[in-house]
Amino acid sequence: MKFELKTTDGRARRGQLVFERGTVQTPAFMPVGTYGTVKGMTPEEVRETGAEILLGNTFHLWLRPGQEVMRAHGDLHDFMNWQGPILTDSGGFQVFSLGHIRKITEAGVHFRHPINGEKIFLDPEKSMEIQYDLGSDIVMIFDECTPYPATYEEARKSMEMSLRWGKRSRDKFDALGNKNALFGIIQGSVYEELRDVSLNGLLEIGFDGYAVGGLAVGEPKEDMHRILEHVCPKIPADKPRYLMGVGKPEDLVEGVRRGVDMFDCVMPTRNARNGHLFTTDGVVKIRNAKYRSDTSTLDADCDCYTCKNYTRSYLYHLDKCNEILGARLNTIHNLRYYQRVMQGLRDAIEQGKLDDFVTEFYRRQGKPVPPLAENDVK
């Protein structure tokens, strides 16, 4: 993988990630394909929304279908018939989400299989092996996602163990002869000093890109913005920056304003299945009875298959009848909306008009523009 930075506007960056499997324009949003599928979508449909890279979940694909099945197909690209780049998470966040049925030690994580109760152990070395078999174009180190809230001391201990696990991940990745990219994950909760220690430790080990982890776990938006403003300028300019598990459309805009290059989130797909649709003028909750006879298009500014062919009334009807097509059409739209936001951000950075884009984005959403830190203002 090669990262090429084309231009900047303030702290926002316009670039591209070059892989053997294709080029990804940044800033980029990665749809989430948990079990080797973006729920309800064919790979061709996902590609048509504008997505150039997907995220797969190491933890879930390890449990089902397992490494043997993956190897029998070649890798995850062959298994799911997506020939573009794939980033896989390490399994750390999923293990964190298991709560009471897992035990974290220096060696790794002991937990019960969430389906059959079997005892399982996952460590940095195993995570690297699984991601190697998946053929991931971007591999993430195995880390502990620090819970929120955490005291300074809790966050410090968690971050330091993640650093040690990061070194073990790097060593195993290299021992496997993996020629793809490996990203480090910056931890440290809401504490700037701990974020610095984490980043410096990761820089000593050396990675192809750097993710900001442990955000979007319940902390106030102001804390997320503050940590991004603090951390992003310290990441080497020639390395991509990835904000994990984020987020709402405005979170993408705010991340880009602060120098983030990559995002992923289940929100556009999960919310689509719940009738929660993102549009240029704000959220449409399609289950609301006011849409029963609404013959207007979902989003007049959108060029997706759903908006070009169907009315809000029809989408309301499909949802009311629990028709599978409703979830699919909603997903097509939400994914396309997210990609249109990213395209708008990329174009604005290229033209040196990011401030204009941001102002118009929030005006249409009916929201105020969040302030940048003083040293971020052009």
Swiss-Prot record:
Co-factor requirement: Zn(2+)
E.C. no: 2.4.2.29
GO cellular component, as recorded: cytosol
Domain of life of the source: Bacteria
Keywords from the UniProt entry: Glycosyltransferase, Metal-binding, Queuosine biosynthesis, Transferase, tRNA processing, Zinc
Assembly: Homodimer. Within each dimer, one monomer is responsible for RNA recognition and catalysis, while the other monomer binds to the replacement base PreQ1.
This protein's name: Queuine tRNA-ribosyltransferase
